[in-house]
């Protein structure tokens, strides 16, 4: 659990009256300046999370610890990071559970890696591949700055297009999660290292990428319940009796494709997010396993 008070060396956010966030890494003796307004880091260190602080010139701001979503949007990046709206969906639709063994590629700036680590918990394991040294370095710094030492992360400078290796214990992965330009090239490797009943998930931004990914899943002959979707996030303005959608929204960012590894020879599309029956009118499956005639 984090300390109740802001600590020296911690990365915090200062938030102004318009809701704009400014990232600050606290360092005793330093001075923070914003548009001519100043505040000593010493005046922020040991403040309670959520305190109102006053900069020179009388400018008031909130000093808060960033949420995970805040941190992702403000952290240094090499590769483009996933938006929080997509990061929030991935642990749910990939069914990432405490104790799961997850393979990820590519690491990028580390946002998805952190989301997976938070979901698997200390008893789980995340193995992540990143081919580019500069991206791997940025991701490592971002992860350490936000999460500290993470002993259940195995970060390797490998190219997933060339293959996926199990760890020395030979235990297959429960989940495979890909954020790569050409995930269809990795589908055969994922089929080999994913346990039966395990879940495959990939994120891509365009329709042609989705088409090639789903075609590869079908060709592999061991994936079923395949589903592709996107999510659109729209905030609302609520000011007294004036309630309306905001003029701007985070619309299309990419597509998530999810599939289950199953016994070879069965192919099916997934169910709709609303439930197992398309129109909601079908009777639930019999628990005793008897067929209806």
Across the structure, where does each feature detected by a protein language model lie?
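N-terminal auxiliary segments of SAM/dcSAM-dependent transferases
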Residues: 1-65
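Conserved SAM-binding loop and adjacent beta-strand
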Residues: 3-4, 74-87
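Conserved S-adenosyl-L-methionine
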Residues: 118-125, 196, 223
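Conserved class I S-adenosyl-L-methionine
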Residues: 97-108
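S-adenosyl-L-methionine
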Residues: 129-178, 183
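C-terminal substrate-binding/active-site "lid" region of AdoMet-derived donor-dependent transferases
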Residues: 184-255
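Glycine-rich helix-loop-beta junction characteristic of Rossmann-like nucleotide cofactor-binding loops
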Residues: 92-97, 119, 147, 169-170, ...
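Conserved SAM-binding loop of SAM-dependent methyltransferases across substrates and taxa
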Residues: 109-122, 192
């Amino acid at each position: 659990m984090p300390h109740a008070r802001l600590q020296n060396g911690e990365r915090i956010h200062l938030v102004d009256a318009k809701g704009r966030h400014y990232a600050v890494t606290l360092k005793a003796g330093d001075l923070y300046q914003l548009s001519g307004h100043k505040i000593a880091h010493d005046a922020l260190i040991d403040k309670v999370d959520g305190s109102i602080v006053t900069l020179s010139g009388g400018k008031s701001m909130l000093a808060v610890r960033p949420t995970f979503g805040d941190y992702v949007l403000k952290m240094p990046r090499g590769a483009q990071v996933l938006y929080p709206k997509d990061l929030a969906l991935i642990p749910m639709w990939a069914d990432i559970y405490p104790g799961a063994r997850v393979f990820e590629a590519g690491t990028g700036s580390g946002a998805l890696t952190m989301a997976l680590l938070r979901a698997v918990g200390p008893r789980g394991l995340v193995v992540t591949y990143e081919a580019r040294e500069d991206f791997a370095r940025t991701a490592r710094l971002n992860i350490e700055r936000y999460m500290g030492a993470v002993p259940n992360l195995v970060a390797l400078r490998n190219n997933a297009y060339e293959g996926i290796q199990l760890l020395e214990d030979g235990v297959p992965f429960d989940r495979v999660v890909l954020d790569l330009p050409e995930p269809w090239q990795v589908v055969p490797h994922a089929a080999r290292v994913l346990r039966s009943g395990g879940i495959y998930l990939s994120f891509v931004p365009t329709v042609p990428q989705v088409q090639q990914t789903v075609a590869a899943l079908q060709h592999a002959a061991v994936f079923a319940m395949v589903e592709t979707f996107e999510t659109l996030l729209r905030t609302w303005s609520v000011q007294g009796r004036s309630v309306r959608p905001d003029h701007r929204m985070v619309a299309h960012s990419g597509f998530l494709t999810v599939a289950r590894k199953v016994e070879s020879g069965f192919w099916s599309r997934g169910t709709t997010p609303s439930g197992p029956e398309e129109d909601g009118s079908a009777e639930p499956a019999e628990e005793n396993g008897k067929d209806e005639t």
